[in-house]
């Protein structure tokens, strides 16, 4: 008798995706982040659902409802901090997942990569809107500053901003619609993640060497299921430690002050995972130029397959490209630091130099290094 997992219409899909899936025998722990992102998404949807049961999306009661969740709801503090810090873990996994893709040339799977870029935008949009919901000072002013950037769009900008606000300022209508979008987007992200996997399984996984692994495949279960479970346990340990020992480590103290449109905080800044993009935005004195640089700082990822000039896929055997890759990582860390600093000397010039270096590395230096490596190998 044939096994039910190979005959049942639903089980067949699960079987071909997670059990009998042929996987390269040499994929390292850098390939764990896909499953970790899936777990992060599940954690966020579940904790978010329980938070939504007690949250009210009204300007008068939003802040109080979050306080009520933390003080009066059974384990409400745990759910709230799991959700807030779960977002940080989500972005850590995202950045490492994208970094892995850049290093090992995974972007050569065009469809999978482009869906991934779309997913990155969707997660960033969701996180931004979620940050507005507690209706603290940083929530309100963050929403005001970031939505205001759309007014830089020629001709339609002002109308567009007022349309998004649902009025002439960030107010009740804005909060209600942000809550609605924040609730629906994770389900869209889950659907996109399904498409992401669908395209990945069309080609099979890449591997550290960047060479074809068709001649050496192993079943996903038990080898990579066990490996994924280890990764998940480490993720849960890290998240639990953060939530139970220092839940406010990555948050902003200003968000414990209720939103006040009449009082601007001294330093308006987003959550840590947006600081690199915020630094790029601030480093250009022109409003429209800054907005374009901000969007392009993420959108440039979609150009990666076209900027690939090397004859090898992975950076595993390309020392010059490796050096530039790690310079890019250091540059992004510098931008993240600058994004959290006030707009004054010397931070302004450091931010501008780091922004120039960011785009130079991706658009010019790395493709040139690849060409140079091709010549060194005399191919």
Swiss-Prot record:
SUPFAM superfamilies: a domain/subunit of cytochrome bc1 complex (Ubiquinol-cytochrome c reductase), Transmembrane di-heme cytochromes. The cytochrome bc1 complex contains 11 subunits: 3 respiratory subunits (MT-CYB, CYC1 and UQCRFS1), 2 core proteins (UQCRC1 and UQCRC2) and 6 low-molecular weight proteins (UQCRH/QCR6, UQCRB/QCR7, UQCRQ/QCR8, UQCR10/QCR9, UQCR11/QCR10 and a cleavage product of UQCRFS1). This cytochrome bc1 complex then forms a dimer. Its cofactor is heme b. It comes from Neurotrichus gibbsii. Pfam families: Cytochrom_B_C, Cytochrome_B. The chain crosses the membrane at residues 33-53, 77-98, 113-133, 178-198, 226-246, 288-308, 320-340, 347-367. Its main location: mitochondrion. Heme b b562 binds at residues 83, 182. The keyword rRNA-binding does not apply. PROSITE patterns: CYTB_CTER (PS51003), CYTB_NTER (PS51002). One of its GO terms (molecular function) is metal ion binding. This is Cytochrome b. Binds 2 heme b groups non-covalently. A ubiquinone binds at residue 201.
């Amino acid at each position: 008798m044939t096994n039910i997992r190979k005959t049942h219409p639903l089980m067949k899909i699960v079987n071909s995706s997670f059990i009998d899936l042929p996987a390269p025998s040499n994929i390292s722990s850098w390939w764990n982040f896909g499953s970790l992102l899936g777990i992060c998404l599940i954690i966020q949807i579940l904790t978010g659902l329980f938070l939504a049961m007690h949250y009210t999306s009204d300007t008068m009661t939003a802040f109080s409802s979050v306080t009520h969740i933390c003080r009066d709801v059974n384990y409400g503090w745990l759910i709230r901090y799991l959700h807030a810090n779960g977002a940080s873990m989500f972005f850590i996994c995202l950045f490492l997942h994208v970094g892995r893709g850049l290093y090992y040339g995974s972007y050569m799977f065009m469809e999978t990569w482009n869906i991934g870029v779309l997913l990155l935008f969707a997660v960033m949009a969701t996180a931004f809107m979620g940050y507005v919901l507690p209706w603290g000072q940083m929530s309100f002013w963050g929403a005001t500053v970031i939505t205001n950037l759309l007014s830089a769009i020629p001709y339609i900008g002002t109308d567009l901003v007022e349309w998004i606000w649902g009025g002439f300022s960030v107010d009740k209508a804005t909060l209600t619609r942000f809550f609605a979008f924040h609730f629906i987007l994770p389900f869209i992200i889950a659907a996109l993640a399904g498409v992401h996997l669908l395209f990945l399984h069309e080609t099979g996984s890449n591997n550290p060497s960047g060479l074809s692994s068709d001649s050496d495949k192993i079943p996903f279960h038990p080898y990579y299921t066990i490996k994924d479970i280890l990764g998940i346990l480490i993720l849960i340990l890290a998240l639990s430690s953060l939530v139970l020992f220092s839940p406010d480590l990555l948050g902003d103290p200003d968000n414990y002050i209720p939103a006040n449109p009449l009082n601007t905080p001294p330093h308006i800044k987003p959550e840590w995972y947006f600081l690199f993009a915020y630094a790029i935005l601030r480093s250009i004195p022109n409003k429209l130029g800054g907005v374009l640089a901000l969007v392009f700082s993420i959108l440039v990822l979609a150009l990666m397959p076209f900027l690939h000039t090397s004859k090898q896929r992975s950076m595993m055997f390309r020392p010059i490209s490796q050096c530039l890759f790690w310079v890019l990582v250091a540059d992004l860390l510098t931008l993240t630091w600058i994004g959290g600093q006030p707009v004054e000397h010397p931070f302004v010039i450091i931010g501008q130099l780091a922004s120039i270096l960011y785009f130079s590395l991706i658009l010019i230096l790395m493709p040139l290094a690849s060409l140079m490596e091709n010549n060194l190998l005399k191919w």
